[in-house]
Every structure is written in C-alpha cells, then in structure tokens.
Amino acid sequence: MHTLAALGSVERLQQVVVVVSPDDAHVWPEAPAWPSHFKRIACGGATRAESVFNGLTALLQEGEHNPEGVQAHDWILVHDAARCLITDLEIKRLIDACLDDDVGGLLALPLPDTLKVAVQGRVSQTLPRQDKWLAQTPQMFRAGPLHAALKAKATENFDGITDEASAMEMAGFAPKLVVGSPHNFKVTYPPDFALAEDFLRSRK
C-alpha cells in the first residue's frame, strides 16, 4: 500500500496498474478509496519477466481498441512491489531524467562495497567496483520496445532476464542510470521487514 500511495501521488502517471497472479486476484480487493486511474490485471506469471510481459501484452492489446489506452510509444514505469519504501520524489527524478532520453533508464546505486567472487565458500577473485551499479526500480522504458525485448526471450522462458533493463540490453539498448536511494531496498528477508518498518515510522 505504501508503494501504491507513492505512485498515486505522482500526477504525471496517467495510470497505475497492479499485475497479480490469477490465483492471487483476491489479495488486492477492489478499494473505492483508490484513485480512478488505478486498475488491477490478474495475468501475472511465474517470474517477474513473465508478469511484466503479460501485463504489457494486455495493456497494448487494450490500446489497439482504445486510443486512450497504452500505445507503443508511451512510457511505462515498472516497479517491484518488494521495494515498498519508494518515494514520489525518486519516481519524479527518474521521470525527469528519462523523459527526453532515446532509450529510458532505471534507478540504481553505485556499488559501495568490495565485490568478491566465491568458489566453494572461499574468495577466488576480487572484482573492480568502479563501474558496478546496483539496479533498483522503477525502471522506465517505452511500452513497445520493452514488450518487443521481452517477447524476443519469451520462448526461452525469459532466460537471463533479471529486470527490464537487462531485457533492453539484450535487445541492443543502453539504459540510462539514474541515482536512486539506499532506502529503496528490496524487502526480502525477515530483517528487511524490521528495517522497513523503522524507515516508515521515521517518515510519520
């Protein structure tokens, strides 16, 4: 809900779409309190890439019959719901940085730590960190090129695609890196939930 609230406060977003699995359609019940431009599509897949591809397919197909729907040239922001600490300021910064870009881009952070390669629990190599970034979301690309990039890997079960930027890279594009926030971390493990709660309390 924190993610939806942040997205809902960005006036330039014409539509906010939540893609859920058909089996989880009950998880996000219809809520009249949400803005009218919020909608839910129960077409999620087994992976993030498949869910994004299915969602884009549904939106573009709808746009074929509705000129006010999503068109291939429209910008799409894809956000991972596990990054529930995203703020409207970070979303706006990404939009400002990418709106006039030929490709689009993503929020990311320069890698601050030394990066090690492990083999059987021991360090085998230390990698230079100067050119390494940690990818975040949202990631912003035009609907048509992103859909085409994902479609090109659909028959391979989206092998090698870990985010939208990686799909665009495989299609020959170089996404723009936009500095994000360390607070926009992915809530995955139990300690992450406690940390996220602390951050949310500090914002009140």
Which residues does each PLM region occupy?
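Conserved core of the sugar-phosphate nucleotidyltransferase
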Residues: 85-178
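Acidic metal-phosphate-binding loop of nucleotide-sugar-dependent transferases
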Residues: 48, 81-85
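Short aromatic/hydrophobic "clamp" motif used to bind/position activated sugar donors
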Residues: 76
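Conserved N-terminal catalytic core of the sugar/cofactor nucleotidyltransferase
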Residues: 1-73, 156
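Residue-level signal for inorganic ion chemistry
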Residues: 55, 79-80, 110, 142, ...
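Glycine-rich beta-alpha junction loops
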Residues: 22, 110-113, 182, 191
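Hydrophobic packing residues within well-ordered alpha-helices of enzyme cores
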Residues: 27-29, 94, 196
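Hydrophobic helical membrane-anchoring modules
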Residues: 184-204
